Each structure stands twice: as structure tokens, then as C-alpha cells.
Amino acid sequence: MYAALRLLTISGVFALSIWGCSTARPDGPFDPGTVPPTPDYSKLDNWAAHPDKADAADRTPCPEAVDWQKTAQADVFFLYPTSYYGRGTRSKTWNAAVDDPKVNTRTDSASILYQATIFNGAGRVFAPRYRQAHLQAFFTKDKESAEKALTVAYSDVLAAFDYYLKYWNNGRPFVVVGHSQGSVHAMNLIRERIEGTPLHSKLIAAYLVGWPVKRDFFRVVKPCESPTETGCFCTWRTWE
């Protein structure tokens, strides 16, 4: 599932140039006994953004801009990038706890505030907190531990998406958005839950940002070729 890790060599150099000096490493190989508790997505605390609560995704850059989430006809399922790194006792496991205040502050004050907000004029924003894999999962030589950590993270994404579909979607069209680690999970979510199913007809578009998408990764979902095309994906590098 996560063979795409091999594609990260160049972007890894970039990321390490930013975080390399301050990034802690997990203590030893992946240990199932240290995995944080599974999130309960019926609790709004386990959503970084949700239309039924006030959060950073509600912000607008100026008084003229409007948050249209209350009247929007579509939804946005947003998967934020890695914010689990740095030093401290809670940075020594392979997966972040969804109630880690330091990680959540990083997530909310950066990705949710400056990325998820661009969608609040078009749809209701749903951004689940998930037990994201540690940043080192993308650079370690311990590929087995990295894959296990990413699998834990992805299991949360699946659970959150399934809960969203069951209780909040109500047949509405939706956009899937991911950035970096979030894009890795979004790609697998689309391939396993959306393309080739009735849900595909509800997919407006997918934005898979900051991660390479191989031409043959999807069976049916194709790159968008026009502003009016639906059921397709857009992707680009977020660095030069």
C-alpha cells in the first residue's frame, strides 16, 4: 500500500532542511503496545474541522470574504499534512495521539488555518484528527516500522470517512483534499473506497497536493483537464 514512500527522496531532502535539526526519532522499532487509543469520530473533539463546531477552518482573510459552510451544497474531506515531529516525551512513538495538544496546535494554526480555510466558501469542511505517522516514517531505514505507522494512520482516515458518509454526508457531492502525508492517505482512500463505486459520481474533484501521483495509480480517476471536469484529480509540487 505504501510503496509510494520510495518516491519521496527529493522531497525528503527538502523537509529535512526545515525540520532536520529539531526532529526527534521514535524510540526503537514500531511497537503495537505504544500505539495511542483509536479515535471515536462521533466526538467533535476528534475533528480538527467540522461544520458543527467553531474551528480554524471557519476563518476568512478579510471582512469581504464569507464562510458559506452553513448553506453550502457540497462537502470537503480534508486530510492535513504531517505535524508530528520535534522533541518531547510524546514524540517518541511512531504515531501521534489525537489529543496531543502540541501536535493539534501545529495542525490548527498552520494547515487548518491556511489551507482548509480556502474551501469554506464552497463546502462544509470536515478534517479528522488521525494518528498520523511520525515525520521520520518518511526517512527512516526501518521501512517495516514506517509502513506499520502509516497503516495505523490510514485506518483512522478510513474510519473517519466511513463515519462521515454514514452520519453527515446524506448523498451530498464532496471534494477530497490532502497535503503531503494527507495526500498519501487520500490517494489510498480514493482508490479503495471511491473509484469504481457509486461514490465516484459524487466526487467533485480530489486535490492531492505535495505528493507524486503515478500515472497508473488509479484505475478510473484521471487528472483534471478542464475547470468544469468532475470526478478527477489535481496534483502539484508544493516546493521548488
Describe every region a protein language model picked out:
Residues 178, 182, 186:
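Gly/Ala-rich beta-loop-alpha elbow adjacent to hydrolase catalytic centers
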